[in-house]
Structures are given as structure tokens and as C-alpha cells.
């Protein structure tokens, strides 16, 4: 996948490659592979084992080991701490101190108050670490807190709208930002409906409707979403001004 992406982009855009593994040694292998394959940065996912609890030293060691094998910038994926995989702010700050190649976090903490606290803590450091929002279900609200960008799965469908929204917020053009948000809202409502696990399946169906994918394929145990839901996605794309009625 990385090789295909690299060949298609031909250096026009940076490539962020995800690193997800339950063990740090496997994470190191993936990081090396991504580095050698031409990635520009690495997005480090938290292991699922953290749902059973984590020590700060465990979380930091996992990231430190990845940084041992590559000098690529690291983006730490911050999950919701309530689920166990997210890092307490104190752990996150220690991690940033001890791993100097951390350049940003992808913030999915799921809490506006915590998101605000993280932005202030990370932006205010002598070596600022950027906060990239992935609160795609409430993107407008998250960006106005002071995020330095966004890293969102729904960018596969609405990257242009997301970029316009970010620029409007950066320019403090509230009226324009609200206007763009009104379009983004329709897609967020269908992409991030229950069950949440189907969000990427829905985005694939949207890309088919937009003529950007020939078909939407899912891997078991995921299943194709029903026709009625695909129709709701079609109506949302129309409401967002992305598809003709």
C-alpha cells in the first residue's frame, strides 16, 4: 500500500504511514519498513492491550522503541482515555519530553475540555507539539480550540471541505466557517452514526456514489451496509453539495 501511494503521489505530497502493533518489536519492524518505503512521517497507534490498563513507562517505552529505528517525525494517536488506550496528559507530556522526534498528536480524546487542555499544554512548550484534530463528528468545534491542523478519515471524501474549514477558522472568518460547517455536518451525521465501527464502510460507499471508487469492499466480520443506509449517504452528499440530486 505504501509503495502504491508513493508511486501515485510521485513526491507531490507527504505520506503519513500508520504503525499499529500489539508488541513494540513488531512496531519497530513496521516503522523500519515504512521508513525504507518512503514515508514522510509515522502515525503511532496505541496497542489494544492498553484497554486492560497501562503504566506511563509502558506507553513511553513503546514510542521510544519506534524512535530508535527511525528519525521520521512521529504523530501520536491520542485515543479517548476512558477506553484505556488514551494517554493521561501527564503521560503524554512525559512522552514528548523523552522522545524528541514527536512532532504532533492526532487528537481523538473525545472530550472538549481535555482537548482544550492538551492544546494549551502542547502549544505552550519550548518545543511546541502540534495538535491535529480527528474529532471529525464535531470538527468545527474542535478546530476553534486552536488545533494546528487535522488528520481525519473522512478526508478521503471531503478533504477539500475540511481544508476550507480549517483555513476559515485560521483566518477568523466565523461566518464562512459556519457556512462550510453546515455542509460538513451532513456527511458527519451519516458517517459517524451508530454502529460507529461502520464509519469507513460508509465512506467507501460515499466514494462509490461520487464515482471515485468502482465498488465498496469490506473484510469480514464487517458486512456491507444496507441499501437504505446507502440511500441516506446519497442524500447527505446531495445536502452537502457534493452530488447532484
What are these regions (language model features)?
Residues 15-19, 42-44, 74-77, 103-106, ...:
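Hydrophobic faces of well-ordered beta-strands that scaffold small-molecule active sites
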Residues 65-68, 80-188, 192-195:
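Catalytic alpha/beta core domains of metabolic enzymes, predominantly
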Amino acid at each position: 500500500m505504501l509503495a502504491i501511494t508513493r508511486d501515485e503521489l510521485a513526491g507531490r505530497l507527504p505520506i503519513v504511514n500508520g504503525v499499529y502493533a500489539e508488541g513494540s518489536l513488531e512496531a519497530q519492524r513496521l516503522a523500519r519498513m515504512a521508513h525504507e518505503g518512503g514515508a514522510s512521517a509515522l502515525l503511532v497507534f496505541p496497542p489494544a492491550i492498553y484497554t486492560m490498563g497501562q503504566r506511563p513507562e509502558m506507553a513511553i517505552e513503546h514510542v521510544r522503541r519506534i524512535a530508535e529505528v527511525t528519525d521520521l517525525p512521529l504523530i501520536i494517536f491520542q485515543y479517548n482515555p476512558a477506553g484505556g488506550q488514551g494517554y493521561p496528559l501527564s503521560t503524554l507530556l512525559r512522552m514528548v519530553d523523552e522522545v524528541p522526534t514527536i512532532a504532533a498528536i492526532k487528537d481523538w480524546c473525545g472530550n472538549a475540555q481535555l482537548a482544550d487542555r492538551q492544546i494549551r499544554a502542547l502549544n505552550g512548550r519550548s518545543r511546541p507539539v502540534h495538535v491535529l484534530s480527528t474529532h471529525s463528528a464535531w470538527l468545527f468545534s474542535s478546530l476553534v480550540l486552536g488545533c494546528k491542523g487535522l488528520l481525519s478519515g473522512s478526508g478521503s471524501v471531503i478533504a477539500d471541505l475540511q481544508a476550507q474549514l480549517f483555513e476559515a477558522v485560521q483566518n477568523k472568518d466565523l461566518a464562512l466557517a459556519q457556512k462550510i460547517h453546515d455542509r460538513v455536518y451532513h456527511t458527519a451525521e451519516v458517517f459517524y452514526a451508530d454502529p460507529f465501527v461502520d464509519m469507513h464502510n460508509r465512506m467507501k460507499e460515499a466514494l462509490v456514489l461520487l464515482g471515485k471508487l468502482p465498488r465498496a469492499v469490506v473484510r469480514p466480520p464487517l458486512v456491507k451496509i444496507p441499501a437504505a443506509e446507502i440511500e441516506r449517504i446519497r442524500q447527505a452528499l446531495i445536502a452537502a453539495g457534493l452530488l447532484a440530486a
